[in-house]
């Protein structure tokens, strides 16, 4: 449940909100604790900054996809997870895109969408162009609106797996079609979700893979 919005809170309260064990060692500059409010490393913070913070995202987002008739869509919809009902318009991606990462790359406040099959500035939305992109965009859960540029992947690719621990986001593998190298990737890219910028090399998967799914906890990510 969210941290209280008034009164005294402790570092232990914050640590437990991000999944830490009560009364265990931690620091206010730990990545998972900072990630709860998207604070950068070494930022000047106070406990009041964590008032109302929650490691549970109240909204679910659906970003882009293929709309049929060989056309990608740029629509972002959302639902309020606590209440059953139809999706509501949130905003738009910069262009129609499908085949982005499978697995969320999110913090408590921000959601990223990486790569995919789409367009880098052209007006066309025809999925038959088979053009992979390296674009990474983000939205803030708290306010509806269009996606904003975050940075770029290490290469143009689609069909990656994704995962995050609220502080760091990862993409695994992927595929580049005839537009580029026509091959699978084994590269793992990572982002610090609180800070916009390009992907950094994390390592490699055991094999070059595409169309995998990803999931992550606070300390480990799985690809399957």
Descriptions of predicted regions:
Residues 2-224:
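Polar, enzyme-active/binding microenvironments
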């Amino acid at each position: 449940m969210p941290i209280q919005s008034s009164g005294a809170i402790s570092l232990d309260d914050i640590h437990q909100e991000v999944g830490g064990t009560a009364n265990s060692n931690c620091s206010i500059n730990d990545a998972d604790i900072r990630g709860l409010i998207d604070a950068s490393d070494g930022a000047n913070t106070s406990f009041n900054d964590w008032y109302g913070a929650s490691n549970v995202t109240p909204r679910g987002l659906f970003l882009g996809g293929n709309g049929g008739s060989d056309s990608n869509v740029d629509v972002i919809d959302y639902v309020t997870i606590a209440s059953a009902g139809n999706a509501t318009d949130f905003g738009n991606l910069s262009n129609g895109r499908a085949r982005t990462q499978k697995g969320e790359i999110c913090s408590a406040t921000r959601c990223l969408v990486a790569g995919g099959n789409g367009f880098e500035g052209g007006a066309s939305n025809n999925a038959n162009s088979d053009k992979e992109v390296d674009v990474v965009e983000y939205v803030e859960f708290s306010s509806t609106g269009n996606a904003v540029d975050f940075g770029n992947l290490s290469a143009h690719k689609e069909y990656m797996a994704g995962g995050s621990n609220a502080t760091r986001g990862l993409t695994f593998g992927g595929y580049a079609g005839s537009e580029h190298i026509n091959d699978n990737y084994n590269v793992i890219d990572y982002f610090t979700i609180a800070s916009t910028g390009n992907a950094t090399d994390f390592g490699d998967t055991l094999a070059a893979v595409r169309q995998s799914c990803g999931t992550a906890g606070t300390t480990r990510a799985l690809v399957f």
